[in-house]
Amino acid sequence: MATIKEIKELLVTVKELESPIFLELEKDNRSGVQKEISKRKRVIQAELDENLRLESMLSYEKELYKQGLTLIAGIDEVGRGPLAGPVVAAAVILPKNCKIKGLNDSKKIPKKKHLEIFQAVQDQALSIGIGIIDNQVIDQVNIYEATKLAMQEAISQLSPQPEHLLIDAMKLDLPISQTSIIKGDANSLSIAAASIVAKVTRDELMKEYDQQFSGYDFATNAGYGTAKHLEGLTKLGVTPIHRTSFEPVKSLVLGKKES
Protein backbone atom coordinates (compact mmCIF):
# COMPACT_ATOMS: atom_id res chain seq x y z
CA MET A 1 0.00 0.00 0.00
CA ALA A 2 1.36 3.41 -0.97
CA THR A 3 2.29 5.80 1.81
CA ILE A 4 0.45 9.11 2.16
CA LYS A 5 3.67 10.89 1.15
CA GLU A 6 3.81 8.85 -2.08
CA ILE A 7 0.13 9.56 -2.77
CA LYS A 8 0.73 13.28 -2.19
CA GLU A 9 3.55 13.22 -4.78
CA LEU A 10 1.29 11.36 -7.23
CA LEU A 11 -1.56 13.86 -6.79
CA VAL A 12 0.70 16.75 -7.81
CA THR A 13 0.77 15.24 -11.31
CA VAL A 14 -3.05 15.18 -11.56
CA LYS A 15 -4.37 18.13 -13.60
CA GLU A 16 -8.06 17.23 -14.15
CA LEU A 17 -10.94 16.78 -11.72
CA GLU A 18 -12.18 13.79 -13.76
CA SER A 19 -8.85 11.95 -13.52
CA PRO A 20 -9.19 8.18 -12.93
CA ILE A 21 -6.47 8.54 -10.30
CA PHE A 22 -9.00 10.32 -8.05
CA LEU A 23 -11.53 7.52 -8.58
CA GLU A 24 -8.96 4.91 -7.61
CA LEU A 25 -7.65 6.78 -4.56
CA GLU A 26 -11.15 7.51 -3.26
CA LYS A 27 -11.39 3.77 -2.48
CA ASP A 28 -8.66 4.30 0.13
CA ASN A 29 -10.48 5.08 3.38
CA ARG A 30 -7.49 6.53 5.22
CA SER A 31 -8.38 10.04 6.40
CA GLY A 32 -4.95 11.36 5.37
CA VAL A 33 -5.50 10.17 1.81
CA GLN A 34 -8.98 11.71 1.63
CA LYS A 35 -7.56 14.98 2.98
CA GLU A 36 -4.90 15.06 0.24
CA ILE A 37 -7.52 14.30 -2.43
CA SER A 38 -9.70 17.19 -1.24
CA LYS A 39 -6.72 19.53 -1.10
CA ARG A 40 -5.63 18.67 -4.65
CA LYS A 41 -9.16 19.05 -6.00
CA ARG A 42 -9.37 22.53 -4.46
CA VAL A 43 -6.10 23.50 -6.14
CA ILE A 44 -7.28 22.21 -9.54
CA GLN A 45 -10.63 24.01 -9.16
CA ALA A 46 -8.86 27.25 -8.23
CA GLU A 47 -6.67 26.93 -11.33
CA LEU A 48 -9.73 26.32 -13.52
CA ASP A 49 -11.48 29.36 -12.01
CA GLU A 50 -8.38 31.51 -12.53
CA ASN A 51 -8.11 30.39 -16.15
CA LEU A 52 -11.77 31.31 -16.73
CA ARG A 53 -11.23 34.72 -15.13
CA LEU A 54 -8.20 35.40 -17.31
CA GLU A 55 -10.08 34.16 -20.38
CA SER A 56 -12.93 36.60 -19.64
CA MET A 57 -10.39 39.46 -19.45
CA LEU A 58 -9.21 38.69 -22.98
CA SER A 59 -12.58 39.41 -24.62
CA TYR A 60 -11.54 42.79 -26.08
CA GLU A 61 -8.22 41.38 -27.28
CA LYS A 62 -9.91 38.39 -28.92
CA GLU A 63 -12.24 40.63 -30.91
CA LEU A 64 -9.16 42.37 -32.27
CA TYR A 65 -7.38 39.07 -32.99
CA LYS A 66 -10.37 38.18 -35.21
CA GLN A 67 -9.61 41.31 -37.24
CA GLY A 68 -6.05 40.10 -37.79
CA LEU A 69 -4.48 42.43 -35.22
CA THR A 70 -1.88 41.07 -32.80
CA LEU A 71 0.12 44.09 -31.59
CA ILE A 72 -2.41 45.35 -29.06
CA ALA A 73 -1.25 47.77 -26.36
CA GLY A 74 -2.99 48.18 -23.03
CA ILE A 75 -2.65 51.68 -21.55
CA ASP A 76 -3.26 52.77 -17.96
CA GLU A 77 -2.10 55.39 -15.48
CA VAL A 78 -1.52 55.72 -11.77
CA GLY A 79 -1.32 58.90 -9.74
CA ARG A 80 -4.10 61.25 -10.78
CA GLY A 81 -5.25 61.92 -7.21
CA PRO A 82 -2.11 62.38 -5.07
CA LEU A 83 -1.01 65.74 -3.71
CA ALA A 84 2.62 65.03 -4.59
CA GLY A 85 4.69 63.26 -7.21
CA PRO A 86 4.20 62.54 -10.91
CA VAL A 87 1.44 60.87 -12.85
CA VAL A 88 2.80 57.65 -14.39
CA ALA A 89 1.38 55.81 -17.39
CA ALA A 90 2.40 52.48 -18.86
CA ALA A 91 1.78 50.89 -22.25
CA VAL A 92 2.16 47.12 -22.55
CA ILE A 93 1.94 44.79 -25.55
CA LEU A 94 1.42 41.19 -24.46
CA PRO A 95 1.84 38.15 -26.74
CA LYS A 96 -1.35 36.81 -28.31
CA ASN A 97 -3.57 34.99 -25.78
CA CYS A 98 -1.03 35.62 -23.01
CA LYS A 99 -2.40 34.75 -19.55
CA ILE A 100 -0.41 35.78 -16.50
CA LYS A 101 -1.64 34.09 -13.35
CA GLY A 102 -2.87 36.61 -10.78
CA LEU A 103 -2.87 39.54 -13.21
CA ASN A 104 -5.75 41.89 -12.47
CA ASP A 105 -6.55 45.54 -11.84
CA SER A 106 -3.56 46.59 -9.68
CA LYS A 107 -5.96 47.81 -6.97
CA LYS A 108 -7.22 44.22 -6.61
CA ILE A 109 -3.79 42.59 -6.38
CA PRO A 110 -2.47 42.09 -2.81
CA LYS A 111 0.46 44.45 -2.19
CA LYS A 112 2.81 41.54 -1.43
CA LYS A 113 2.12 40.19 -4.95
CA HIS A 114 2.79 43.46 -6.82
CA LEU A 115 6.47 42.88 -7.57
CA GLU A 116 5.95 39.22 -8.52
CA ILE A 117 3.26 40.04 -11.08
CA PHE A 118 5.16 43.13 -12.27
CA GLN A 119 8.15 40.86 -12.95
CA ALA A 120 5.95 38.33 -14.78
CA VAL A 121 4.67 41.12 -17.05
CA GLN A 122 8.26 42.30 -17.64
CA ASP A 123 9.31 38.76 -18.54
CA GLN A 124 6.43 38.02 -20.93
CA ALA A 125 5.56 41.34 -22.57
CA LEU A 126 6.62 41.98 -26.16
CA SER A 127 7.15 45.64 -25.35
CA ILE A 128 6.69 48.06 -22.43
CA GLY A 129 6.69 51.85 -22.42
CA ILE A 130 6.52 54.14 -19.39
CA GLY A 131 5.54 57.81 -19.36
CA ILE A 132 6.25 60.04 -16.35
CA ILE A 133 4.89 63.58 -16.14
CA ASP A 134 6.06 65.56 -13.13
CA ASN A 135 4.12 67.81 -10.78
CA GLN A 136 5.27 71.01 -12.48
CA VAL A 137 3.70 70.00 -15.79
CA ILE A 138 0.57 68.80 -13.94
CA ASP A 139 0.25 72.28 -12.41
CA GLN A 140 0.73 73.93 -15.81
CA VAL A 141 -1.68 71.90 -17.93
CA ASN A 142 -4.01 70.17 -15.35
CA ILE A 143 -4.05 66.51 -14.33
CA TYR A 144 -6.30 65.33 -17.17
CA GLU A 145 -4.02 66.73 -19.87
CA ALA A 146 -0.94 65.54 -17.97
CA THR A 147 -2.39 62.02 -17.91
CA LYS A 148 -2.79 62.09 -21.69
CA LEU A 149 0.80 63.30 -22.06
CA ALA A 150 2.04 60.44 -19.87
CA MET A 151 0.09 57.92 -21.94
CA GLN A 152 1.39 59.35 -25.22
CA GLU A 153 4.95 59.23 -23.89
CA ALA A 154 4.51 55.58 -22.86
CA ILE A 155 3.11 54.62 -26.28
CA SER A 156 5.96 56.40 -28.10
CA GLN A 157 8.46 54.09 -26.37
CA LEU A 158 6.86 50.89 -27.66
CA SER A 159 8.77 48.89 -30.25
CA PRO A 160 7.20 47.56 -32.34
CA GLN A 161 4.51 50.22 -32.39
CA PRO A 162 0.99 48.89 -31.64
CA GLU A 163 -1.75 48.32 -34.19
CA HIS A 164 -4.49 49.11 -31.67
CA LEU A 165 -4.76 50.72 -28.23
CA LEU A 166 -6.95 49.54 -25.36
CA ILE A 167 -7.16 52.48 -22.95
CA ASP A 168 -8.66 52.79 -19.51
CA ALA A 169 -11.46 55.38 -19.89
CA MET A 170 -9.56 57.77 -22.15
CA LYS A 171 -9.28 58.79 -25.80
CA LEU A 172 -5.95 59.96 -27.19
CA ASP A 173 -5.26 62.21 -30.18
CA LEU A 174 -3.05 59.67 -31.95
CA PRO A 175 -3.18 58.12 -35.45
CA ILE A 176 -3.66 54.64 -33.98
CA SER A 177 -7.05 52.92 -33.73
CA GLN A 178 -8.17 52.68 -30.12
CA THR A 179 -10.87 51.49 -27.76
CA SER A 180 -11.70 53.34 -24.54
CA ILE A 181 -12.90 50.91 -21.87
CA ILE A 182 -14.62 51.93 -18.63
CA LYS A 183 -12.89 50.09 -15.76
CA GLY A 184 -10.50 48.78 -18.37
CA ASP A 185 -7.97 47.55 -15.81
CA ALA A 186 -10.59 45.08 -14.53
CA ASN A 187 -11.84 44.08 -18.00
CA SER A 188 -8.75 43.78 -20.19
CA LEU A 189 -5.57 41.83 -19.43
CA SER A 190 -3.53 44.22 -21.57
CA ILE A 191 -4.75 47.20 -19.54
CA ALA A 192 -4.30 45.26 -16.28
CA ALA A 193 -0.67 44.64 -17.28
CA ALA A 194 -0.19 48.37 -17.86
CA SER A 195 -1.89 49.07 -14.53
CA ILE A 196 0.58 46.98 -12.48
CA VAL A 197 3.60 48.34 -14.38
CA ALA A 198 2.50 51.93 -13.76
CA LYS A 199 1.67 51.20 -10.11
CA VAL A 200 4.98 49.55 -9.22
CA THR A 201 6.98 52.15 -11.16
CA ARG A 202 5.29 55.03 -9.35
CA ASP A 203 5.46 53.36 -5.92
CA GLU A 204 9.23 52.87 -6.34
CA LEU A 205 9.62 56.52 -7.36
CA MET A 206 7.71 57.66 -4.28
CA LYS A 207 9.96 55.50 -2.07
CA GLU A 208 12.95 57.35 -3.53
CA TYR A 209 11.25 60.68 -2.84
CA ASP A 210 10.64 59.53 0.73
CA GLN A 211 14.42 59.36 1.17
CA GLN A 212 14.79 62.91 -0.16
CA PHE A 213 11.84 64.42 1.69
CA SER A 214 11.35 62.71 5.03
CA GLY A 215 8.40 63.54 7.25
CA TYR A 216 5.62 63.07 4.67
CA ASP A 217 5.47 59.25 4.66
CA PHE A 218 5.69 59.13 0.85
CA ALA A 219 6.94 55.51 0.92
CA THR A 220 3.63 54.44 2.43
CA ASN A 221 1.06 56.91 1.06
CA ALA A 222 2.60 57.40 -2.43
CA GLY A 223 1.75 61.10 -2.21
CA TYR A 224 -1.95 60.69 -1.38
CA GLY A 225 -3.44 62.96 1.27
CA THR A 226 -3.24 60.69 4.32
CA ALA A 227 -3.20 62.00 7.89
CA LYS A 228 0.60 61.62 8.13
CA HIS A 229 1.10 63.39 4.81
CA LEU A 230 -1.14 66.30 5.83
CA GLU A 231 0.64 66.48 9.18
CA GLY A 232 3.96 66.71 7.33
CA LEU A 233 2.61 69.50 5.12
CA THR A 234 1.46 71.48 8.16
CA LYS A 235 4.74 71.04 10.05
CA LEU A 236 7.30 71.10 7.24
CA GLY A 237 5.59 72.92 4.39
CA VAL A 238 5.53 72.18 0.67
CA THR A 239 8.27 70.20 -1.13
CA PRO A 240 9.41 70.64 -4.75
CA ILE A 241 7.35 67.56 -5.74
CA HIS A 242 4.02 68.83 -4.36
CA ARG A 243 1.26 69.79 -6.80
CA THR A 244 0.58 73.44 -6.08
CA SER A 245 -2.65 73.40 -8.10
CA PHE A 246 -4.13 70.78 -5.72
CA GLU A 247 -5.77 71.58 -2.40
CA PRO A 248 -4.73 71.88 0.39
CA VAL A 249 -1.25 72.46 -1.10
CA LYS A 250 -2.53 75.44 -3.10
CA SER A 251 -3.83 77.21 0.01
CA LEU A 252 -0.60 76.54 1.91
CA VAL A 253 1.44 78.12 -0.90
CA LEU A 254 -0.91 81.12 -1.11
CA GLY A 255 -0.82 81.54 2.66
CA LYS A 256 2.97 81.53 2.65
CA LYS A 257 3.06 84.17 -0.10
CA GLU A 258 0.62 86.40 1.76
CA SER A 259 2.43 86.18 5.11
Swiss-Prot record:
Q: Which gene encodes it?
A: rnhB
Q: What's an example Gene Ontology biological process for this entry?
A: DNA replication, removal of RNA primer
- State the similarity comment: Belongs to the RNase HII family.
| MF-aspect GO terms | manganese ion binding; RNA binding; RNA-DNA hybrid ribonuclease activity
What are the residue boundaries of the RNase H type-2 domain, all occurrences included? 70-258
Which reaction equation describes what this protein catalyses?
Endonucleolytic cleavage to 5'-phosphomonoester
- The name of this protein is Ribonuclease HII
Q: What is the protein's major site of localization?
A: cytoplasm
Q: Where does a divalent metal cation bind?
A: D76, E77, D168
